[in-house]
Amino acid sequence: MERAIPGNDTREPAYGERWNGGPGGSTSPFQLPDESPSWTEWRLHYDETNSNQDNPLGFKESWGFGKVVFKRYLRYDGTETSLHRVLGSWTGDSVNYAASRFFGFDQIGCTYSIRFRGVSVTISGGSRTLQHLSEMAIRSKQELLQLTPVQVESDVSRGRPECQTFKEESE
């Protein structure tokens, strides 16, 4: 079993099972091991005054197939090398293989969820749309991880630059 991640808000179906599978495991879609911070490390980086802030050491992601949910916490420091490493934490083939272990004759629900810097994205669909679901999950993960705090801060605090440019041109 995996360690519980403090502040984890990824939804699990009622009575859902949590599997670790380990890297290269026969069932898990993940190809990297769980990198959850230790309790001491988590306490050092967690801001108790802002309960909506995530641990800045990485992000949480999960794949769910029916009642079975696989979760990972991966370290991510915002560098290009780190981005390429975490983008390879699972592939379409590893997801298809893991999901096929739980498919029967009926369609089951499949869900991908990622939480990074207070933003949570969940994509879900049926097992018949798994290929499309994994493609959307890859795009969402890449876009979410490439948003840096500087980009978010500049858009919010400085207003929309295209509006300022338009005003300058019209004067």
Swiss-Prot record:
Keywords: Host-virus interaction, Inhibition of host innate immune response by virus, RNA-binding, Suppressor of RNA silencing, Viral immunoevasion
Bias (Basic and acidic residues): 1-15
Gene Ontology terms, MF aspect: RNA binding
Gene Ontology biological process terms in this record: symbiont-mediated suppression of host innate immune response
Spans annotated as Disordered: 1-32
Gene3D superfamilies in the cross-refs: RNA silencing suppressor P19
GO CC, one annotated term: virion component
Subunit structure: Homodimer.
Family: Belongs to the tombusvirus protein p19 family.
Function of the protein: Viral suppressor of RNA silencing which binds specifically to silencing RNAs (siRNAs). Acts as a molecular caliper to specifically select siRNAs based on the length of the duplex region of the RNA.
The protein, known as: RNA silencing suppressor p19
Native species: Tomato bushy stunt virus (strain B8)
